[in-house]
Amino acid sequence: MAKDTTGRLHVTVKSAGRLKHSSKLWLERQLDDPYVQQAKRDGLRSRAAYKIIEIDDKYRFLKPGISVVDLGAAPGGWSQIAAKRVGSAEGRGQVIAIDLLEMPNIPGVTFAQMNFLDDNAPARLFEMMGGKADVVLSDMAANTTGHRKTDQLRIVGLVEDAAAFAADVLRPGGTFVAKVFQSGADATLMTQLKRDFATVKHVKPASSRKDSSERYVLAMGFRGAAGGADEPPV
């Protein structure tokens, strides 16, 4: 599950003669990207952190004291922002970061190395949190094949899985934010979200690259699952 990072660039464009053309373009873009450089200065693990900052600055769902789940969290940029805004490092809220990959510790963030698609994942999360979540975040992107139609289906499928997980673990009134890509393949996803949430919209933060079809779906006001608000999902 691909995510952008701001790790040190060990090669320069000039010395990258052995790289493929696509890799050179990526490297040039990283070196020229002001958000990559700003993330390093701000001590953030990825430029993606600015995306959730922008979205939350406008819609204000990361409130002090709430419970947040970050799916596909590595390298941890979104978790860093969530922890700061809910106050989990000071014990005022909690952030659970979930990923298949290992992730270095972040103050105020509890890391769970697991697959959120496992049947017992919602119950495990519920046990860790002692209740359901107020916000579920997902900046995940499916691994691509280069075949446009196949990739679109994979991307939408991953978001649908994240949305289903959110429906299992969110409290009524909760919020779901997930990365999607502009295409005609997400109609079913949007229909499902509009059924489960009071407000659903697409947002594209300024820090999302202009030449990218990337955008985010923001679903607020979860209508609630069949069970009680704080009973373990089954």
Language model features by range: what are they?
Residues 72-76, 181:
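Class I SAM-dependent methyltransferase "Motif I" SAM/SAH-binding loop
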Residues 2-67:
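Class I SAM-dependent methyltransferase Rossmann-like catalytic core
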Residues 89-92, 170-175:
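Short glycine-dipeptide loop
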Residues 182-234:
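Class I S-adenosyl-L-methionine
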Residues 92, 98-145:
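S-adenosyl-L-methionine
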Residues 156-172:
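A short glycine-rich, Lys/Arg-flanked "PGG" loop and its adjoining helix->strand segment in the class I
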